[in-house]
Amino acid sequence: TFIDHAKPHCTSRELYKGILSGKARAVFNGKIVVRLDAQKTDAMQTNKNLLLSEEGRVDTKPELEIFANDVKCKHGATVGQLDKEALFYLRSRGIPERESRRLLIQAFANQALAGLPIESIREGVTELLLARLVGN
């Protein structure tokens, strides 16, 4: 991804989420540039990844290139697996493992999916995502 701030008072929020299963590989290479004239820019770049297997791999490289001196910019990246304690908690409440995994995967994806403005599309994408990933 590439975001180029060239004028003052720009704002950007980039959220890029990945969910990997099996032997999947993913690369995130995102860059935000804040030009000299783009004073008062407020930019945030976030990459979050969820690995559903031991074989999956994510390479993530968020970048900020800032030429202005009066800005508020940040970036970050995370790679993790399903929270075993959360999975245990759900299981201890009688929720089957498959449903527990589905709930945790959906919770992870919801932040990105919430940005889809048409509800029927959002629901369809959510169902496709869960159908593909829950059995892994």
Sequence positions of predicted segments:
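Active-site gating/interface segments in enzymes
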Residues: T1-N136
